[in-house]
Amino acid sequence: MPTNRAAWQPAKKAPLLEVKAAPYPPPKANRIVVKNGAVAVNPIDWLIQSKGDIMFTWLKYPFVLGSDVAGEVVEVGKNVTRFQVGDRVLGFARGTDEKVNDSSEGAFQEYTVLVPDLTAHIPSSLSFESAAVIPLGLATAGAGLFQQDQLGLQLPTSPARPPTGQTVLIWGGSTSVGSNAIQLAVAAGYEVFTTASRKNFEYAAKLGAAKVFDYRSGSVTQDIIRAFKGRTSAGALAIGQGGAEACMEVLDHVQGRKFIALASYPVPQEEPKRLVMLRTIIFFVSWIISFKFKGLLKGIKSNFIFATSVNHNGIGKALFVDFLPDALRAGEFVPAPDAQVAGKGLESIQTAFEQQKQGVSAKKIVVSL
């Protein structure tokens, strides 16, 4: 049996990961084990590290975090037929999901257990580093666009579906979630309006956005409203601080679907110095009540996205099994944003956290293993 090592979150709010031995996770009947060639980091990883008593309260430490992996299949459960040892894959590691809560399914280790329906074959031309940028962004975008409790759009296909005649607004097009959402929406037959900084206009357009707007412009919402004239809204996906409020302003003045899928959580502009947990909860609840009430007055509904929900409703299979392998092979879906490699080895994951905290634009921080 192989030996395994992991970058453990040793305790709640412990400031540094600890790299040490971890159990090798043999697969259950409906699981596979992947030897990771690369992993990606996401803001949720270092937010759990710094605010562990506010979110993901069910985690029992020490714990292995991480959601994005790419590597080679080394073991398959007896009921798995779609994968074989040696297959190159990417996968959404769902260890932090409340219904899973299992370090063996965390990304930040040498070997990770994956669910076949959240795993996709990748072409030989695609590096593990590039593939690792996809899983969580794909799942989050897919949940927001296609789940029935979200926008409920028709599913993507490869090749893309014919145009529906509807337009979806994606606020934050150069983010990881936004980059995936643009491509998914286009593959599903929707026109995409998105926002980005001016330096990322070309980037968003290459992913398939029909129109890109400068989110820093003081007239951005009015510019989008004017562009929607004569068009029918399919709803909005809001990513990043301030995106939800801006999407509400736009949807209040356009025809069609008035629903916002919320991919980001509001955070206080200033970190509370005392009673941190209580004050943060009060801020969060107050924001939700205020936002929902404003939406009620305008006839606009909204819902927060939980990426792991795609594992429980068939959307995960539709994305990772039915769509992504063919789309990657045909070049109709590209890994985006580009990978920015922070280093090699599990010891580099904490460094990757720090790099991402500083902010990146149209990039995703990746660690080679």
UniProtKB/Swiss-Prot annotation:
Its main location: membrane. It is found in: Membrane. SUPFAM superfamilies: GroES-like, NAD(P)-binding Rossmann-fold domains. One of its GO terms (cellular component) is membrane. Its EC number is 1.-.-.-. One of its GO terms (molecular function) is nucleotide binding. It comes from the Eukaryota. Pathway: Secondary metabolite biosynthesis. InterPro entries: ADH-like_C, ADH-like_N, GroES-like_sf, NAD(P)-bd_dom_sf, PKS_ER, Trans-enoyl_RdTase-like. Induction: Expression is positively regulated by the azaphilone pigments (MonAzPs) gene cluster-specific transcription regulator pigB. It holds the Pfam family ADH_N. As colorants, MonAzPs are widely used in various food products for centuries. Moreover, MonAzPs also possess wide-ranging biological activities such as antibacterial activity, preventing hypertension, lowering cholesterol levels, causing hypolipidemic effects, and displaying antiobesity and antitumor activities. Glycans are attached at residues 79, 101. The keyword Nucleotide-binding applies. It is a single-pass membrane protein. The chain crosses the membrane at residues 280-300. The keyword Nucleotide-binding applies. Residues 13-367 form the Enoyl reductase (ER) domain. NADP(+) binds at residues 44-49, 197-200, 215, 360-361. Belongs to the zinc-containing alcohol dehydrogenase family. Dehydrogenase; part of the gene cluster that mediates the biosynthesis of azaphilone pigments (MonAzPs), a complex mixture of compounds with a common azaphilone skeleton very widely used as food colorants. Within the pathway, pigH might be involved in the late steps of yellow pigments monascin and ankaflavin biosynthesis. The first step of the pathway is performed by the nrPKS pigA that forms the hexaketide precursor from successive condensations of five malonyl-CoA units, with a simple acetyl-CoA starter unit. This is Dehydrogenase pigH. The gene is pigH.
